[in-house]
């Protein structure tokens, strides 16, 4: 395993989530959070889907573009992953989100965070 592979793996997860949020908004919201899929939440989910797609594209391309600076970008992704892990955990603990999806997301996000950190040192 190397840092380039971690970026590519995360890109795939982000792109899948982005496409799900963008094109299957009501399912993504209802299954992913346990909330009622209102038109407002679906619109927000579509916006979030585009953000996830863009982040997925960046994650896919960074190894090719960054060159020798890839470890610095990996550390930034580790920091971002730590923040995402913290907010997902906060939402789970406070009961703001429900279902299996948040647990899967927090585990995946934490694993990517650790991988980015350890392979970027």
PLM feature spans:
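Membrane-water interface at the C-terminal end of transmembrane alpha helices
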Residues: 110-121
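Hydrophobic alpha-helical membrane segments
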Residues: 73-88, 107-112
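Membrane-helix boundary connector in multi-pass membrane proteins
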Residues: 64, 86-103, 119-121
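Membrane-helix boundary elements
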Residues: 3-6, 17-42
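Non-cytosolic membrane-interface motifs at loop->transmembrane helix junctions
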Residues: 33-42, 72, 96-107
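N-terminal membrane topogenic signal
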Residues: 1-11, 119-120
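Juxtamembrane helix-break-helix junctions at the cytosolic face
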Residues: 58-71, 92-93
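Core segments of alpha-helical transmembrane spans in multipass integral membrane proteins
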Residues: 15-20, 40-63, 76-83
């Amino acid at each position: 395993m190397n840092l380039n592979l971690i970026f590519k793996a995360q890109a795939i997860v982000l792109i899948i989530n982005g496409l799900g949020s963008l094109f299957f908004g009501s399912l993504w919201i209802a299954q992913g959070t346990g909330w009622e899929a209102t038109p407002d939440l679906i619109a927000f989910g579509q916006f979030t889907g585009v953000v996830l797609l863009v982040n997925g594209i960046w994650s896919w391309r960074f190894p090719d573009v960054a060159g020798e600076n890839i470890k610095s970008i990996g550390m930034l992704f580790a920091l971002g992953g730590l923040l995402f892990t913290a907010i997902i955990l906060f939402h789970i603990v406070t009961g703001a989100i429900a279902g299996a999806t948040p647990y899967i997301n927090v585990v995946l996000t934490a694993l990517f965070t650790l991988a980015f950190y350890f392979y970027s040192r």
